[in-house]
């Protein structure tokens, strides 16, 4: 079963994952479809179902529980018409095996070609799980080479208003931005961002530099994700 929740601004991963659910014939339930029309119409106050911009409170979880229960009730009511014979799970994969042999690299696993502003250090959010970070409080720059199919970054979002925006370039082309600012949010946390996805492994030159116009400069890279 796939259960799709929602952020206060309406963001949901329904559009991202619904094709996977359809391909494997999985049940899909949308909390967004239940609450967002009511929030948009003003008949439901977001603060009644969430203490922040994303996490359900007790009332929010109650609604989710009702959504799941109603679906399960519909299944129980139709048991006589459901074929419960064993079926081999031999459905062809919907996507390529992009993340086979995936790994998370720390700062000490990278040999920079160029580096300034970044230092190797830890963090206070995941000090034991991810102790090997690239950290900058000033204007950091990092350049390294790697060979991979897919590339992403695991970095720290911060509520102190100091989180900077850093552009990521692959082979000279900007592929994404790491935005570490989460001012006013519920707390510091690790954010993942995919930068590159491909079926074939190739050598790449990766650069991380402060985005134009970013007045904040702090960034902690918790890990570099590759496959």
Where do the language-model regions lie?
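Structural beta-sheet core signal
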Residues: 1-4, 153
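Generic low-polarity alpha-helical segments
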Residues: 2-3, 11, 202
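Hydrophobic transmembrane alpha-helix bundles
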Residues: 3-4, 34-47, 115-128
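Catalytic His-Asp segment of secreted/periplasmic serine-dependent ester chemistry enzymes
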Residues: 7-103
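Conserved catalytic region of serine esterases and O-acyltransferases that act on ester linkages
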Residues: 66-227
């Amino acid at each position: 079963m796939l259960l799709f929740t929602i952020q206060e601004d309406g963001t949901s991963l329904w559009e991202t994952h619904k094709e996977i659910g359809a391909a494997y014939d999985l049940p899909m339930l949308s909390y967004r479809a239940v609450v967002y029309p009511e929030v948009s119409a003003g008949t439901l106050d977001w603060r009644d179902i969430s203490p922040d911009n994303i996490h359900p409170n007790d009332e929010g979880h109650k609604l989710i529980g009702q959504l799941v229960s109603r679906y399960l009730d519909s299944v129980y009511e139709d048991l006589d018409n459901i074929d419960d014979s064993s079926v081999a799970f031999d459905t062809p994969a919907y996507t390529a095996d992009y993340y086979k042999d995936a790994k998370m690299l720390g700062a000490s696993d990278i040999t920079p070609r160029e580096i300034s502003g970044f230092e190797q250090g830890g963090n206070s959010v995941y000090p034991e799980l991810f102790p090997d970070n690239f950290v900058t409080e000033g204007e950091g720059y990092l350049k390294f080479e790697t060979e991979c199919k897919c590339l992403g970054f695991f970095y720290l979002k911060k509520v102190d208003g100091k989180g900077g925006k850093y552009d990521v370039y692959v082979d000279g082309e900007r592929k994404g931005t790491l935005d570490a600012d989460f001012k006013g949010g519920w707390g510091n946390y690790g954010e993942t961002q995919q930068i590159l996805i491909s079926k074939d492994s190739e050598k790449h030159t990766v650069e991380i530099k402060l985005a134009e116009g970013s007045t904040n400069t702090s960034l902690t890279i918790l890990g570099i994700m590759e496959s």
